[in-house]
Swiss-Prot record:
Single Gene Ontology MF annotation: proton-transporting ATP synthase activity, rotational mechanism
Protein name per UniProt: ATP synthase subunit delta
Gene3D superfamilies membership: N-terminal domain of the delta subunit of the F1F0-ATP synthase
UniProt-listed InterPro entries: ATP_synth_OSCP/delta_N_sf, ATPase_OSCP/dsu
Chief location of this protein within or outside the cell: membrane
Keyword Ion transport: yes
Entries under Pfam families matching the protein: OSCP
GO terms under cellular component: plasma membrane; proton-transporting ATP synthase complex
Record's keyword annotation contains Membrane: yes
Quaternary structure and partners: F-type ATPases have 2 components, F(1) - the catalytic core - and F(0) - the membrane proton channel. F(1) has five subunits: alpha(3), beta(3), gamma(1), delta(1), epsilon(1). F(0) has three main subunits: a(1), b(2) and c(10-14). The alpha and beta chains form an alternating ring which encloses part of the gamma chain. F(1) is attached to F(0) by a central stalk formed by the gamma and epsilon chains, while a peripheral stalk is formed by the delta and b chains.
Length: 178
């Protein structure tokens, strides 16, 4: 995974710098998201791995599948990635691009998993507290997992806050073992 990120980083950085310079961050994020989804398709992966096809043929097929969703610069990006055999890295490129975009916008995606559904008021309060703690705008994504028994698990980038009953029971069990 780290190797893929290392290979994807220059492409994500170049795409981000281009999109930022032309004030097209949202468009490029959408285009790279589509490209990532297309590259993850099983049929497309077989085509991209086919040794008998040239990089130009792979790029043309890729662009054909995406239709008119790509502007000229995005098509050029696909050609460059194909020439360097990096089309299969598009999911990592897209993820890194979105990370750079979030950093630039001073925002962070936060995944909140709770034992029970959070109402809008609870989500708003949680987002406000997390925003103050993280110093960034928070985009909250809530989900439910009954196996937590109670409480919440919050994930924001590398930060994980486990306030679930299941997590506390696991810590207690670990303490009793030692």
């Amino acid at each position: 995974m780290a190797e893929l990120t290392t290979l994807a980083r220059p492409y994500a950085k170049a795409a981000f710098e281009h999109a930022q310079a032309h004030q097209q961050l949202a468009n490029w994020s959408a285009m790279l998201g589509l490209a990532a989804a297309v590259s993850e398709d099983g049929t497309m992966q077989r085509l991209l791995k086919a040794p008998q096809l040239t990089s130009a043929e792979k790029a043309a097929a890729f662009i054909e599948v995406c239709g008119d969703k790509f502007d000229a610069q995005a098509q050029n990006f696909i050609h460059v990635a194909a020439e360097n055999d990096r089309l299969l890295l598009l999911p990592e490129i897209s993820a890194l691009f979105d990370l750079y975009k979030a950093e630039q916008e001073k925002s962070v995606d936060v995944e909140v998993t709770s034992a029970f559904a959070l109402n809008q008021e609870q989500q708003d309060k949680l987002a406000k507290v997390l925003s103050a703690r993280l110093g960034q705008e928070v985009r909250l994504h809530a989900s439910e997992d009954a196996s937590l028994i109670g409480g919440v698990v919050i994930r924001a980038g590398d930060l994980v806050i486990d306030g679930s009953v299941r997590g506390k029971i696991a810590k207690l069990a670990e303490a009793l073992k030692s």
